[in-house]
Amino acid sequence: MTRSEALFEQAKKTIPGGVNSPVRAFNGVGGSPLFIEKANGAYIYDADGKAYIDYVGSWGPMILGHNHPKIRAAVLAAVENGLSFGAPTELEVQMAEKVISMVPSIEQVRMVSSGTEATMSAIRLARGFTNRDKILKFEGCYHGHADCLLVKAGSGALTLGQPSSPGIPEDFAKHTLTAVYNDLDSVRTLFEQYPTEISCIIIEPVAGNMNCIPPIPGFLQGLRDICDEFGALMIIDEVMTGFRVSQSGAQGYYGVTPDLTTLGKVIGGGMPVGAFGGRKDVMQFIAPTGPVYQAGTLSGNPIAMSAGLAQMEALCEEGLYEELSAKTKRIAEGFKAAADKHGIPMAINYVGGMFGFFFTEQPEITRFDQVTQCNIEQFRIFYHGMLDEGVYLAPSAYEAGFLSMAHGEEEMRLTLEAADRVLASMKAAS
């Protein structure tokens, strides 16, 4: 028994399922999860001391790589002054100014402590601002675990094989409408059915919780136009894509302007941080300037703000996103080339620092229903083969992969050589 396996057995005695977030349990791929002891650059190290090239990156935040010296130094300096004050700090102001300078649609921003808090608060604000109850989301998209959002959710809930989570009253769920991602007709149909009841659309601009599905041309702008036509707000959930797809997020990359944006992951530099922001007239509707209540004991935590600011400043380096995109393209297209070489059907998607691969004969994956038709068993075999080779991918066929600036020539070469060996083995066994 490895030390990770022993720790997992120990953890299950005191922690539900042995983990603090379901996807970490490896239910989607089988076997026991790795328990991680440390990380540096492009590598994570398990409890047995084995190194892995990491394509999870703490599920997205580690865009510069693990244990980045500038972020570590910023955190250590901040700790010298105390851990939490429950009062305003200059760091919060600096973070707000940095976010606003990078995302043109955000005129004011409120810090919170998680992506779920950000989306939950943005939806409450949209409902309060429009005085409407219903929201519209998309099948396969994931926006955190708030009750109103776990309706035909993606990510871990998708692995459970349930359209929604138990414990959510029907009275909550009835206010959440679910459309088909990349299908404007399904959105318009719902708006025509409820023309004055929908407060907002919330969307992952690149769906990262049914693997990685970019928007088809015109889709995001089409949503913007429908919101304008029916008086609803458009919320772009950039918890995953914010500052990962481009310096101004997916909204900047695709040229669409939302009313509200939710952020997380990258803005925390690895610390627990979320944020929501947007039009000033909408944001002024939040307490204390407006009637919509929202609060948080640790919101704007100085340690988290220090880590986030250090990362955000580093992301302003010229040419960084072009380099990151090139790395991502190389890995995604390298996987596809290896699969083609060995006669194993595979489709790929990638944008910015995100990528996805699908074991399928479908030439292109753009919708949730296509994702559910992919070969999950082949993914599991590939996953464990890569893990044995020292490459750590997301332990679910429904999660995106992430590159970092720390992934260099050596790491990419080793990864693609490993993929070639694993795919060759899969073909030989078929």
UniProtKB/Swiss-Prot annotation:
CDD domains: OAT_like (cd00610). It catalyses: (S)-4-amino-5-oxopentanoate = 5-aminolevulinate. InterPro entries: 4pyrrol_synth_GluAld_NH2Trfase, Aminotrans_3, Aminotrans_3_PPA_site, PyrdxlP-dep_Trfase, PyrdxlP-dep_Trfase_major, PyrdxlP-dep_Trfase_small. Keywords: Cytoplasm, Isomerase, Porphyrin biosynthesis, Pyridoxal phosphate. GO terms for molecular function: glutamate-1-semialdehyde 2,1-aminomutase activity; pyridoxal phosphate binding; transaminase activity. GO terms for biological process: protoporphyrinogen IX biosynthetic process. Pathway: Porphyrin-containing compound metabolism; protoporphyrin-IX biosynthesis; 5-aminolevulinate from L-glutamyl-tRNA(Glu): step 2/2. Its EC number is 5.4.3.8. It is found in: Cytoplasm. GO terms for cellular component: cytoplasm. The modification N6-(pyridoxal phosphate)lysine is found at residue 265. Its cofactor is pyridoxal 5'-phosphate. Pfam families: Aminotran_3. Homodimer. Belongs to the class-III pyridoxal-phosphate-dependent aminotransferase family. HemL subfamily. This is Glutamate-1-semialdehyde 2,1-aminomutase. The gene is hemL.
